[in-house]
Regions:
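Solvent-exposed, acidic/flexible segments
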Residues: 29, 33-37, 70-71, 80, ...
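An amphipathic, aromatic/His-enriched active-site/gating alpha helix that lines ligand/cofactor pockets
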Residues: 46-58, 78-132, 144-145
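Acidic helix-start/capping segments at beta-turn-to-alpha-helix junctions
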Residues: 57-78
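Extended amphipathic alpha-helical interaction segments
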Residues: 137-142
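Boundary at the C-terminal end of the N-terminal hydrophobic targeting segment
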Residues: 15-17
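Sec-dependent N-terminal signal peptides
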Residues: 3-13
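Intrinsic-disorder/low-complexity, polar/charged segments enriched in Ser/Thr/Lys/Arg/Asp/Glu/Gln
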Residues: 19-23, 74-76
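N-terminal targeting signals for Sec/Tat export/insertion, comprising classic cleavable signal peptides
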Residues: 23-58
Length: 146
C-alpha cells in the first residue's frame, strides 16, 4: 500500500519522464558479511541483470558503506527504473524473473536464510531531477555493463 501511495505522489508531480530509484538500506548482522554478499551477488544481482536485459530497469548498484558513525546500515541496494510506469510494474516483472531464474528459491551460503544474516532497515524511493552520464552510457549499456 505504501508503494502505491508513493507511486501516486510521483505520478502527480510529473514522474512519468524521470527515472525512479529504489534504495534499500540493509544492516548486515555481526559476522555475516560473507553470507550477505553471497546472497546479493548470486540472487539480487542475477535478477537485476535479467531485468536490465529485458528493459525492466535502467541500472542497479550495491553500495557498501565505508564509514557510518551511527553504525545503522552497511549496504545500500539501488535499483533504477526508467520511469514511474516501469516502477509500477516492478513487482510483476520481478515475480516473473524470480520464478524462472531461481524456481527453487535463492542460493544461500551456509544454509542461512536472509533473516539470519541481514535486516532490511528502510526503503527510500526517489525521483531523478537531473544527472550526468559517463561518456559510454547508452540505454543499452547503462554504465555498469562495460
Amino acid at each position: 500500500m505504501r508503494h502505491v501511495l508513493i507511486l501516486l505522489l510521483l505520478i502527480s508531480v510529473n514522474g512519468y519522464s524521470q527515472s525512479i530509484s529504489v534504495l534499500d538500506f540493509v544492516q548486515v548482522k555481526e559476522g555475516h558479511r560473507a553470507e550477505a554478499v553471497f546472497f546479493y551477488e548470486n540472487n539480487w544481482k542475477l535478477y537485476r541483470d535479467i531485468a536490465v536485459k529485458k528493459g525492466f530497469i535502467l541500472s542497479y548498484r550495491l553500495e557498501e558503506v565505508v564509514a557510518d558513525s551511527a553504525g545503522t546500515f552497511n549496504l545500500v541496494l539501488i535499483t533504477e527504473y526508467r520511469d514511474s510506469v516501469f516502477f509500477q510494474n516492478s513487482e510483476a516483472n520481478f515475480r516473473e524473473i524470480l520464478a524462472t531464474a531461481r524456481p527453487n528459491g535463492p542460493l544461500l551460503l551456509n544454509h542461512l536464510q536472509p533473516a539470519d544474516f541481514r535486516k532490511n532497515l528502510f526503503v527510500k524511493i526517489t525521483r531523478n531531477l537531473f544527472r550526468s552520464y559517463p561518456p559510454i552510457y547508452t540505454t543499452e549499456n547503462p554504465g555498469h555493463l562495460e
